A protein has these predicted regions:
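Rhodanese-like catalytic fold shared by cysteine-dependent sulfurtransferases
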Residues: 1-4, 12-57, 61-106
């Protein structure tokens, strides 16, 4: 969709297997399992950059983490247009969709 921004919240080492073209990457948790506080800043920046009406689509490995975080951003932080890639990257690949190489330039 033109008014959607996709945010891949998987771990960095999972990005090495590829990412969905056009997505932004910001891991939800660090290697120790602690929440990445910069994720909130990234989502706010994307929403402000694109306009508050933008839809933020969270992408995780299997969709579960994305669903939990998407719900938190919608309910606790007041983001109106939040959704999740159902089934995550696993479902994406099951549907024979492509991934592109992750570039470590940001």
């Amino acid at each position: 969709e033109d008014n959607a921004v996709a945010l891949d919240i998987r771990l960095e080492n999972q990005w090495e297997n590829g990412v969905i073209k056009g997505t932004f990457q910001e891991t939800a948790f660090n290697k120790d399992g602690k929440f990445n506080v910069y994720l909130m800043d990234k989502v706010r920046a994307l929403a402000a950059e694109e306009s508050q009406n933008i839809e933020i689509v969270f992408i995780s490995h299997d969709g579960e983490t994305a669903a939990i975080l998407g719900n938190a951003f919608a309910e606790d932080l007041g983001f109106k247009n939040v959704s999740v890639l159902k089934g995550g990257i696993l479902q994406w690949l099951k549907e024979d969709r492509k991934l592109v190489s992750h570039k470590k330039d940001n």
